[in-house]
Structures are given as structure tokens and as C-alpha cells.
Amino acid sequence: MISMSAKIGVSTAASMVSQAIGRLGTTVEQAGEMGRTWEDRSVRVIVAEKYFMRIGSFASLTVMVSGDAESSRVEAVASGAGDGLLNFNWGARQDFEEDFRRQMRDLGYA
């Protein structure tokens, strides 16, 4: 699981998340996005999936962006990507999360 905070508003952070997802490779697709706003706070949830050849399966990445117009928190967790009866993922989930973290940092979200 990833948790990052920055002095970046929720709308900008959500755009950065979409950009980061787009940079994760040709087998990544943003599956959906939803959001809610109340008073001065917002929450955006973005879901992506990526195909991993090493396991012949998809992993999903669920990202939650929360905060206000001045600061935000990005939290993400990868799931799925298991293979076989024992659900081995051969590091696919960890790689998906770490690749996403790296892309967010490269875009300036620390």
C-alpha cells in the first residue's frame, strides 16, 4: 500500500494520478473514476488495471485522492494478479504499486 501527501490540490493531484497511470506501460488501462465533494473537501477514486505477462493475469490498482484545494493525500493499493490455487502473484502487485509511486514522484508529487 502507498500513502503520499503533498501541498497540491485534489483536482491537480487527480490529474497527476491519471498521468502516472498512463505512463505505466502499454498494458495499463484506467478502468474508472468517481468522486465526491462536500464543503471544501473532495475525494476521488481512480481504478486501473494492468496485464502482467509473467502471471498471465491482470492486477488492479485502486487509488484514492483526498483533501482540499491546497493539499492532498494519495493512497493506492494493488490487488488481484494471483495465479493458481495458491494465488501466487510473483511480485506483480508490489511492482505495480512501486511503479505507480515512482511515476507520481517523477511528476512532482512527493
Task: Name each region found by the language model.
Residues 41-48:
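Short, hydrophobic/aromatic-rich segments at coil-to-beta transitions
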Residues 83-110:
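A conserved amphipathic terminal alpha-helix motif
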Residues 21-28, 81, 108:
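A common structural junction motif
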